Amino acid sequence: MSRGIIIIGSGFAARQLVKNIRKQDAHVPLTLIAADSMDEYNKPDLSHVISQSQRADDLNRQLAGEFAEQFNLRLFPHTWVADIDADAHVVKSQDKQWQYDKLVLATGAAAFVPPIAGRELMLTLNSQQEYRACETQLRDAQRVLIVGGGLIGSELAMDLCRAGKTVTLMDNAASLLASLMPPEVSSRLQHHLTDMGVHLLLKSQLQKLEKTEAGIRATLVSQHSIEVDAVIAATGLRPETALARRAGVAVNRGVCVDSYLQTSHPDIYAIGDCAEINGQVLPFLQPIQLSAMYLAKNLLGGNAPLKLPAMLVKVKTPELPLHLAGETQRSDLSWQITAESDGMIAKGMSGEGQLRAFVVSEDRMKEAFALLKTLSV
């Protein structure tokens, strides 16, 4: 008798995988185990909850019970997986255990909180649960410090500013989105945030946080300090690899998988923010959707290697939206930038004259798909 497929996790990757499996097989036993409620919500919406005046429960799209009924699943919410016995094909929690034929790790990634004095005062917004824990503080806060000027930090800074808050955005780098693109490309967003009233503290590092009568004092390495009501850590994500490590599965930055999404153990797979696919961690929606399509086939007996095309990454900054694609972080590209009142096109060219990356903003985003077709990958 088939012991079926167990998926650990209940986020976007897990749900996409369930839907793709059920398109091909209505009856294979499917079990999901996760530490949260398993209710569905749209995680990217967390970047806009404050300006939209949304509470955590407003984000719900589908309750866990409805999901289980729709896709014929066994669900175990609020359940921590303690261990995996890979040789025996057994998943263990504190008081239960489940046998499997195939196991999928969809454990996601955790928000990184800088290891400074007072780090417990920092808020994170990487899940509905985390937002629920701090929504009152964030709603009431007038002065907010965001640590980290990457994708999430920039999105949150714009959102909080639109909500009428006094926002300071801090980063070690000399420009925003520094790990994604050069300063001459990100400067348009940087200027726009400044014009909106966001105070930028670039080339700055946080040293400590202290609770005061007036709120929180944030002290920089430079000894400059500011008083705020809330501090948000937007300093990146770390793939959740502890469970894979305990199971004896190879990990690096993420859980190491090949083009078949298979780990170093033949019956254990990984998908989503926790997975490192052939050396790359790709925590974006499109690669996760494609991974789910291919992994569903492979779990049901197929042998289909994942092929990822050139893909768009969308920066959700509504007053100055950006799309980017290709190797935008490469330092050896020559950038051709056309900036006009209706938007910007920035093309990253190789020494051989090939288009290797691009960034488009505002009304010029409509040119993204044509550029995508000419991108060298």
From Swiss-Prot:
InterPro entries: FAD-bd_OxRdtase (IPR050260), FAD/NAD-bd_sf (IPR036188), FAD/NAD-binding_dom (IPR023753), NO_rdtase_NorW (IPR023961), Rbx-bd (IPR041364). GO terms for cellular component: cytoplasm. It comes from the Bacteria. GO terms for molecular function: oxidoreductase activity, acting on iron-sulfur proteins as donors, NAD or NADP as acceptor. It catalyses: 2 reduced [nitric oxide reductase rubredoxin domain] + NAD(+) + H(+) = 2 oxidized [nitric oxide reductase rubredoxin domain] + NADH. It is an enzyme of class 1 (oxidoreductase). It is found in: Cytoplasm. Keywords: Cytoplasm, FAD, Flavoprotein, NAD, Oxidoreductase. Its cofactor is FAD. Pathway: Nitrogen metabolism; nitric oxide reduction. One of at least two accessory proteins for anaerobic nitric oxide (NO) reductase. Reduces the rubredoxin moiety of NO reductase. Belongs to the FAD-dependent oxidoreductase family. PANTHER family: NITRITE REDUCTASE [NAD(P)H], PYRIDINE NUCLEOTIDE-DISULFIDE OXIDOREDUCTASE DOMAIN-CONTAINING. This is Nitric oxide reductase FlRd-NAD(+) reductase. It comes from Salmonella gallinarum (strain 287/91 / NCTC 13346).
